[in-house]
Amino acid sequence: MCNDISEILGIKVKNLKITQNLGLHVHKNVQALFYEGQLTYHPSACECCGIKNDNHLIIKHGFRKTNVYMGLIFERPAYLKLKKQRFYCKACQRTFTAETPYIQPRCTISNEVKRMMTWKLSKVTSEKDIAESLCVSPSTVHRHLKVVSNSVKTHAHYVLPEHLAFDEFKSTKDVEGAMSFIYCDSVTHDIIDILPDRRKHQLEAYFLKFSRKQREKVKTVSIDMFPPYIALIQDLFPDAEIIIDRFHIVQAINREINRCRVQVMNGFRTKERPQYNKLKRYWKLLLKAPIDLDRMIYQPYRLFKSWQSQYSLVQYLLNLDETLKETYETGHRLLSALKANDIQQLRFILQDAKTKDTSKGLKRVIHTFIKYMPYISSTMRHRHLTNGPIEGINNKIKLIKRVSYGYRNFWNFRNRILMISKVFVSEYKK
């Protein structure tokens, strides 16, 4: 049976001995556990002048008493009344205090509590909730966040990865631009850095801190269709291929198909209400790929008197308006070519679509695709490099803002994002 209080509490630190259990006492209006301990040893040299401790040159010089917060024990805050040994150096006639890895000098919170604080800061939890769970003040948690965040900052001497992904997100009101900038490694999905402004001149000033040799090593950059990103990459990453994110291409096509449906639907709003209701109810089927529509199984559908299959229902809706039909067919032909990674077929469809009576919105999208065709070709060559990882990171950023009820200061927000993404890395990324 073990009767050593230090071993029972799991404190295995050299030279630190817990001597007594003082029991429960009220501290800050809460019942807390109190222990008494002592820290002493024989120093090998003076910490002030560095002289070796020969012939009793350094002698013991009393104790300094401090209350060290140990964290929660049995769901109660625990404190250690620690007596730290003081030493006197006869050579320099100065005094110094004994030190231990259990607690930092001139600090009253143990390193175990700080490690737990770091772990909780890496989770999507508000700082106030972390402080409450550890029985410390929110300002203590915030100070610790600032200290730990220094270890995850990006510096100009860092090596840029070969594959990058750029994106933006809405951060805080104290930034100058409307959106903030974030970029990550497309392969490992690790955040590299977060900037307060996505405007081109700000990004140029930032990336010019990296040497040209580092920037030339970048092979691909995945982006959405934001024109300043394209100009920036061409200027600063001369050997990098620009990849238009596949999701944004699909989203642009689907959005215009849906907009055309809404325009046609609103035309039937006062004239033919049944057609309006059908277009409104079955909008999802118009966005579904034609090859995935069921043609064999007929069943009753609301608003239809006769049984329909998914395919026949869609054909009925398309026959209501010729523009809707052309927009639907052209849009899904583009999506099919994109899914098959057939660049020649995509080029043919884009040229052929110029003669089709599609909606104005889809014509604008087609014009944009023709303009960005070299970058869309890169999208098809690098089918596994997308902005998907960084879009997932942006979803987590929104979750952090929601849980924390927003942030006022951009740098505090940035530090928290980097803490959550960089402090503890998954095993498969190591």
Regions found by a protein language model. Give the residues of each.
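Helix-loop elements that line ligand-binding/catalytic pockets
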Residues: 276-358
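Acidic, glycine-enriched active-site microenvironments
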Residues: 107-115, 193, 340, 356-357, ...
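Short, conserved DNA-binding cores of transcription-related domains
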Residues: 1-100
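Conserved beta-strand -> loop -> alpha-helix junction used to position metal-binding or nucleic-acid-contacting
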Residues: 224, 234-278, 391
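RNase H-like nuclease fold core
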Residues: 143, 147-222, 227-232
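Short, conserved catalytic/metal-binding motifs centered on acidic residues
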Residues: 35, 89, 130, 164-169, ...
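Basic, amphipathic alpha-helical segments enriched in Lys/Arg and hydrophobic/aromatic residues
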Residues: 122, 353-430
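Extended interfacial segments that mediate partner engagement and assembly in macromolecular machines
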Residues: 75, 80-85, 93-169, 176
